[in-house]
Regions:
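Sequence/fold signature of self-assembling virion shell proteins
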Residues: 1-4, 9-28, 46-52, 59, ...
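Generic, well-ordered alpha-helical segments
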Residues: 12, 40-44, 52-54, 70, ...
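Short coil/turn connectors at secondary-structure junctions
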Residues: 15, 57, 131-133
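Residues immediately flanking
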Residues: 23, 64, 140
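Active-site-surrounding "flap" and adjacent substrate/cofactor-binding loops of secreted or lumenal enzymes
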Residues: 25, 34-46
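Alpha-helical scaffold segments that mediate packing/assembly in large oligomeric complexes
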Residues: 63-129
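Extended, solvent-exposed, turn-rich assembly/linker loops in the middle of proteins
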Residues: 100-169
Length: 211
């Protein structure tokens, strides 16, 4: 789901801080007749700045004998496990940043249903969020509840729009639905538009020491 966001890598400074320039508030238009001369007003830029979190794994020791005595490449196995752990942690931390603590709007009840997806669609419509580029991320339980709420015809139509190559498990009410085993504490479903959230990657390093 991380790829469904604005890539801010080009705005990373010194590998630690993201600085994104912004044109400021949305402009308004007026209806004539026009009084002339018009006085120009200066635009005020607003800046989006945030720090990149440092995410790491603890060092691991591989005995020298393991390089020769094991039937598999232990170093590659350890590196693969580290990459997997880092990727999962990065995804969780970015999701926390997207959801935040004060700006999210709770729409669902005790059981997730297609009506909750419709409510999310209505909320984004009210905010003039573009139709194209809307996504909905569900945890495993919400996904099960959603499928259970659909009729057989609705479920077949939903699953027919799945795209494994992009991670989309189906489309419903304008959302491309994605699945993750879990989101963050207290959140089971999250709807967003790809141009209203961003991601950025700083420097990454691996350290090794051989005896």
């Amino acid at each position: 789901f991380l790829s469904k966001s604005f890539n801010a890598d080009q705005f990373v400074r010194a590998g630690k801080v993201v600085h994104i320039p912004n044109a400021g508030a949305k402009l308004s238009a007026s209806v004539g007749p026009i009084s002339r001369p018009k006085t120009a007003t200066e635009t005020t830029d607003t800046e989006l700045t945030f720090e990149i979190k440092e995410i790491y794994t603890d060092p691991l020791y591989i005995q020298n004998a393991d390089k020769y005595e094991l039937s598999y490449d232990k170093r590659d196995a350890v590196l693969s496990a580290c990459r997997s752990a880092l990727s999962d942690k990065v995804a969780t931390e970015i999701l926390k940043s997207w959801i935040g603590t004060t700006t999210k709007t709770k729409l669902i009840g005790t059981t997730f249903s297609r009506q909750d997806v419709l409510k999310a669609q209505t909320k984004l419509n009210e905010q003039d969020i573009p139709q194209e580029g809307r996504y909905l991320l569900l945890d495993a339980k919400c996904y099960e509840e959603l499928l259970s709420d659909l009729t057989e015809v609705q479920a077949n139509a939903f699953l027919a729009t799945a795209n494994a190559s992009t991670g989309v498990v189906g489309k419903l009410y304008g959302f491309e639905v994605m699945l993750r085993s879990s989101l963050i504490n207290g959140v089971s479903a999250f709807a967003w538009h790809k141009d209203y959230v961003c991601r950025a990657q700083g420097d990454h390093e691996m350290f090794e020491q051989e005896n």
